[in-house]
Amino acid sequence: MSYTVQYEKRALKELSKLPATAVRQILTKIDSLSTDPYQTGIKKLKGFENVFRARAGNYRILYEVNDGKLLIMIVVVGDRKDVYDQ
């Protein structure tokens, strides 16, 4: 069972600002999330419903999961020190 991945505009904007090596690392992680969005190491964010955090090196991926539609919405991508301020 594979999930469809979609991106919010701000996530795409942040991805475009990152170095190519970081983007490759993040996209590899997102690809693995499409097969299992609840894999080991994933944490649910407190205070949000169905919003999770994945690590990709020093970067964080915040995403929502809709199991009914098999959809993962990438909400925010960024450096770990900045991503939670958005």
Over which residues does each language-model region extend?
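Enriched for short, Lys/Arg-rich terminal
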Residues: M1-R24, Q39, R55-Y59, E64-Q86
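Detector for the c-type heme attachment site
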Residues: L27
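A short, surface-exposed loop/turn module that caps and links secondary-structure elements
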Residues: I30-A54
